Amino acid sequence: GEPFLHPLLPQFITIAHQKGFIPILTTNGTLLDNAQSVIDAHPHKVQISLQAHEGNTKENPEEYIREVMHFAKEAARQGIIIVLRLWNEGGEHNSMNPELLKLMAQHVPTPWTERPDGWKLSELIYLETDTTFEWPDTERAPYEQNEAFCHALRNQIGVLVDGTVVPCCLDSQ
């Protein structure tokens, strides 16, 4: 689920810190306009999946990127790592990538420092690109039992939208 929907998210981040965890959030970035309380709770990293824009109802890319970049710059000022993700290379939903990059450059001027997985836009703000991510599905062929292995529980947990804690975000069923 979208973590920014949960009204207790800042408290969850605080509790995670108290228990010795390193809170990392992944969001589609559509609810960042009122996220100061999340910044104040100071997660270690926030990953924003920009490719989600084409699949969501937010029709105005300028407003979307303005909100994302405002959040990113404010969070980075407070020492939070921001990873903007475009994981849709080679997919059918990437026609807006050039426009999104152009809009980002209005907020964080180029040239950006190239990295193996994308670019460093500014201090603590990164843009990562990758191929389209497909969730593993045991119902989809071809699938072999030994093919799917999740390393998540070794260094992370998932929290589902209903608050259920799972070893891996794929454990929703």
Model-identified regions with their sequence ranges:
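Radical SAM/AdoMet-radical enzyme domain recognition
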Residues: 2-116
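Accessory C-terminal segments flanking Radical SAM cores
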Residues: 120-173
